[in-house]
């Protein structure tokens, strides 16, 4: 789906041809077209699993399209060419019939001109893949991923279930799965730990899980606590030097608590 550049080689072949009663030089011009697919460069594929993502946000724009081999490797089944002008509602309405109304739970959707490839394995959603503008959690999480890794390819999964985690785990090209949800207060109840264990142990993914937005111990959190997951908490900024965590306690890694996110 990438527009491949064409290198045109002009070969001039001069041949003397003997014609009846005279000699003439005939110039033969042969055009040879060689297609060269530009390299993607160094990258990693990160799979945020969250509420949805605002694919219309300027933060996710990309002035190129991904190469066919990458899209085929991720199992893309559908392309949505997004409307680029107007409010979120105006653009959604313009693309509704051709895109959002026809996406199914088995589709993997690529939006050319963005960094986003997305899927919604759960059917219980009003608009597949898209984030509710009044929510924005998945959009913000993905923005933080790109702040840390500007060259990341985003394989976004909408949902909070084992099926959502496994949709990312089953992708051979996905490197990292990141989740930022769970029970309030890190109540030690079953969550997605079975699916993240499969993702890490069986499929060799890296899983990072956010701690709860309280000082509750991260080790008991179903997302951040398992030994195969990397638990992330937030710390107070400025001169705190990570001494005061604001989101979970006893994490594996403390990250900055406040960022300017989309």
Model-derived segments and their meaning:
Residues 22-45, 51-59, 189, 198, ...:
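Protease zymogen maturation seam
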Residues 38-42, 147-149, 170-172, 199-202, ...:
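Extracellular/periplasmic catalytic domains that process cell-envelope and extracellular macromolecules
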Residues 133-140, 153-231, 239-241:
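Substrate-binding/access-modulating region of protease and related hydrolase catalytic domains
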Residues 50, 221-262:
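Extracellular S/T/G-rich loop segment that most often corresponds to the catalytic His/Ser-adjacent loop
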Residues 36-144, 152, 172, 230, ...:
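Active-site core segment of subtilase-fold serine proteases
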Residues 52, 64, 182-184, 213, ...:
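Short glycine-rich anion-binding loops that position phosphate/pyrophosphate groups of nucleotides
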Residues 1-36:
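Secretory targeting signatures
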């Amino acid at each position: 789906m990438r527009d491949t550049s064409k290198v045109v080689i002009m070969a001039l072949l001069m041949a003397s041809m003997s014609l009846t009663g005279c000699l003439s030089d005939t110039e033969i011009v042969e055009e040879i077209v060689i297609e060269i697919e530009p390299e993607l460069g160094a990258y990693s594929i990160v799979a945020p699993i969250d509420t949805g993502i605002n694919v219309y946000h300027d933060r996710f724009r990309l002035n190129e399209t991904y190469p066919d081999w990458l899209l085929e490797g991720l199992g893309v089944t559908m392309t949505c060419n997004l409307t680029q002008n107007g409010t979120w509602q105006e653009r959604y309405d313009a693309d509704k019939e051709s895109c959002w109304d026809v996406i199914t739970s088995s589709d993997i959707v690529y939006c050319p001109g963005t960094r986003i490839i997305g899927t919604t394995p759960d059917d219980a959603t009003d608009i597949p893949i898209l984030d509710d503008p009044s929510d924005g959690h998945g959009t913000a999480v993905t923005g933080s991923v790109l702040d840390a890794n500007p060259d990341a390819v985003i394989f976004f999964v909408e949902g909070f279930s084992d099926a959502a985690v496994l949709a990312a785990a089953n992708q051979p090209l996905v490197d990292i799965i990141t989740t930022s949800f769970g029970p309030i207060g890190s109540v030690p109840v079953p969550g997605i730990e079975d699916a993240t264990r499969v993702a890490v142990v069986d499929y060799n993914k890296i899983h990072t899980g956010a701690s709860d937005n309280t000082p509750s111990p991260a080790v008991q959190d179903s997302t951040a606590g398992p030994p195969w997951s990397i638990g992330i908490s937030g710390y107070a900024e400025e001169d705190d030097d990570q001494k005061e965590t604001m989101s979970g306690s006893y994490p594996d890694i403390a990250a900055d608590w406040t960022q300017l996110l989309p």
